[in-house]
């Protein structure tokens, strides 16, 4: 997320974190690879004035999920949600673009980057097809275990001083539960490599066993340092709240949460 798009309170927290070596907002992909076009049809781009600034995940036909710090302090009427994108520098016929009707948050604390999740209601309903689909979410409390292989993704920069790619990037990561507060964040590392998420467009999904288990939130110690884990908001801790928002606003999940054994609730 560009500094000019942050609220003064969030910006102050980020600068202090950088100075002290603490958490800083994420997340660009460092050390990843280009994703196959539309391999992740639930991936969304949050944009202002035609420019991408954060990722998001389609969780119902008229709702996306993202990081709270992405929209903290923003006039939501300036935000557009783009579905079905792959190459942001091309005019793609696969895209569906929506304005924001309403934003729901759940006690976001910008100073500690806690509860870094928002649900964004679109001004219309997405057309579900091969390029635009609803993500699978975990059931409440059914988080991801230690050493689970996952996939992070985003359109952010390839490094702190490198430009952003035009096409969606993906990165294999591994969950490390002993390096963060389990019910507060999902943390990941890339074993034996300097790779990970970085400053820029947060809000993108962490996919583990075909479920979106995390929302890109913050980093410590620099981009892809290999020393500190990257942190994601834990979707499983908010699953009941997410479902209540969707159900109370006259839409429904197209695919229902599943438990660890794959059973539909």
From Swiss-Prot:
InterPro entries: Peptidase_S1_Elastase_sf, Peptidase_S1_PA, Peptidase_S1_PA_chymotrypsin, Peptidase_S1A, Trypsin_dom, TRYPSIN_HIS, TRYPSIN_SER. SUPFAM superfamilies: Trypsin-like serine proteases. Disruption phenotype: Knockout mice are more easily killed by wild-type E.coli, but the knockout has no visible killing effect on E.coli deleted for outer membrane protein A (ompA). Reduced fibrin formation in response to FeCl(3)-induced vessel injury. Residues 1-26 form the signal peptide. GO terms for molecular function: cytokine binding; heparin binding; peptidase activity; protease binding; serine-type endopeptidase activity; transcription corepressor activity. Pfam families: Trypsin (PF00089). The active site is at residues 69, 116, 202. Keywords: Disulfide bond, Glycoprotein, Hydrolase, Protease, Serine protease, Signal. Glycans are attached at residues 123, 172. Gene3D superfamilies: Trypsin-like serine proteases. One of its GO terms (cellular component) is collagen-containing extracellular matrix. Its EC number is 3.4.21.37. The keyword Glycoprotein applies. It comes from the Eukaryota. One of its GO terms (biological process) is biosynthetic process of antibacterial peptides active against Gram-negative bacteria. Residues 29-247 form the Peptidase S1 domain. Disulfide bonds join 54-70, 150-208, 180-187, 198-223. It catalyses: Hydrolysis of proteins, including elastin. Preferential cleavage: Val-|-Xaa > Ala-|-Xaa. Belongs to the peptidase S1 family. Elastase subfamily. Serine protease that modifies the functions of natural killer cells, monocytes and granulocytes. Inhibits C5a-dependent neutrophil enzyme release and chemotaxis. Promotes blood coagulation. Through the activation of the platelet fibrinogen receptor integrin alpha-IIb/beta-3, potentiates platelet aggregation induced by a threshold concentration of cathepsin G (CTSG). Cleaves and thus inactivates tissue factor pathway inhibitor (TFPI). Capable of killing E.coli; probably digests outer membrane protein A (ompA) in E.coli. Interacts with NOTCH2NL. This is Neutrophil elastase. It comes from Mus musculus.
């Amino acid at each position: 997320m560009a500094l000019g798009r942050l609220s003064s309170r969030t910006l102050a927290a980020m600068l202090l974190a950088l100075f002290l070596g603490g958490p800083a907002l994420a997340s660009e992909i460092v050390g990843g690879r280009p994703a196959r076009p539309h391999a992740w049809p639930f991936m969304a781009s949050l944009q202002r004035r035609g420019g991408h600034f954060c990722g998001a995940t389609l969780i119902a036909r008229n709702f996306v999920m993202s990081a709270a710090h992405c929209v903290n302090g923003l006039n939501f009427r300036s935000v557009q949600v783009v579905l079905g994108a792959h190459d942001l520098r091309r005019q793609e016929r696969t895209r569906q673009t929506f304005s924001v009707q309403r934003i729901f948050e759940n006690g976001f604390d910008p100073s500690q980057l806690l509860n870094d999740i928002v649900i964004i209601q679109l001004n219309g309903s997405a057309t579900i097809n091969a390029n635009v689909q609803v993500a699978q979410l975990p059931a409440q409390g059914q988080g991801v275990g230690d050493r689970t292989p996952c996939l992070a993704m985003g359109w952010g920069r390839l490094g702190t001083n490198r430009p952003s790619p035009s096409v969606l990037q993906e990165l294999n990561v591994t969950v490390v539960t002993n390096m963060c507060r389990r019910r507060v964040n999902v943390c990941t590392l890339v074993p034996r490599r300097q790779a990970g998420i970085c400053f820029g467009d947060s809000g993108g999904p962490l996919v583990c066993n075909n479920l979106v288990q995390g929302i890109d939130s913050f980093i410590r110690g620099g981009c892809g340092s290999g020393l500190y884990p990257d942190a994601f908001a834990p979707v499983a801790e908010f699953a009941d709240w997410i479902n209540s928002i969707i159900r109370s606003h006259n839409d429904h999940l197209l695919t229902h949460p599943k438990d660890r054994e794959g059973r539909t609730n």
